[in-house]
């Protein structure tokens, strides 16, 4: 919405995708540049084997899941079901999950309710400070479908299960 409001008053508009050009209302001064990807994402992708070894993954599949820095209730609920299933069925995975700021207590309650716990196969944190490294190591990512997350997933070529947010402007996920 902010971009749409400011577009008429700026010299140049940068758009992430071609579909945004007309919506921004200033096609004559809009350039499609795609979404930026942090250089660290590309750099760490080259260190995949070393990062996996550091994590102690061995031959296990690494699943990385997160719902954003604040946390997404539905992502935490779905991931809790998956973690319970993984542990019940002794699946050979290393699951790394970030609950987000408002998901810590919820996830702890879900652990008790569903009968699973962090340990050798499950690492739960509030926030991920080393996302480029974990994206490099992961085999599968479960997350919201934010534009920058999608750009980073594409940059490192990771398979993903994307959970759209119901709370975005103009249904952009």
How would you name each of these model-derived features?
Residues 32-33, 125, 163:
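Hydrophobic residues at beta-strand termini and immediately following loops
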Residues 47, 53, 57-140:
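Donor-nucleotide binding loops and adjacent catalytic segments primarily
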């Amino acid at each position: 919405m902010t971009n749409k409001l400011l577009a008429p008053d700026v010299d140049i508009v940068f758009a992430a995708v071609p579909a945004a050009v007309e919506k921004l209302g200033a096609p004559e001064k809009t350039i499609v540049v795609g979404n930026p990807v942090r250089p660290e994402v590309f750099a760490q992708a080259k260190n995949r084997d070393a990062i996996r070894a550091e994590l102690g993954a061995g031959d296990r599949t690494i699943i990385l899941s997160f719902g954003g820095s604040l946390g997404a209730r539905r992502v935490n609920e779905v991931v809790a079901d998956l973690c319970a299933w993984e542990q019940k069925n002794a699946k050979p995975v290393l699951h790394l999950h970030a609950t987000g700021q408002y998901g810590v207590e919820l996830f702890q309650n879900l652990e008790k309710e569903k009968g699973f716990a962090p340990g050798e196969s499950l690492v739960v944190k509030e926030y991920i400070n080393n996302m480029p490294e974990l994206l490099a190591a992961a085999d599968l990512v479960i997350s919201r479908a934010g534009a920058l997350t999608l750009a980073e997933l594409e940059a490192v070529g990771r398979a993903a299960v994307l959970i759209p947010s119901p709370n975005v402007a103009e249904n952009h996920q």
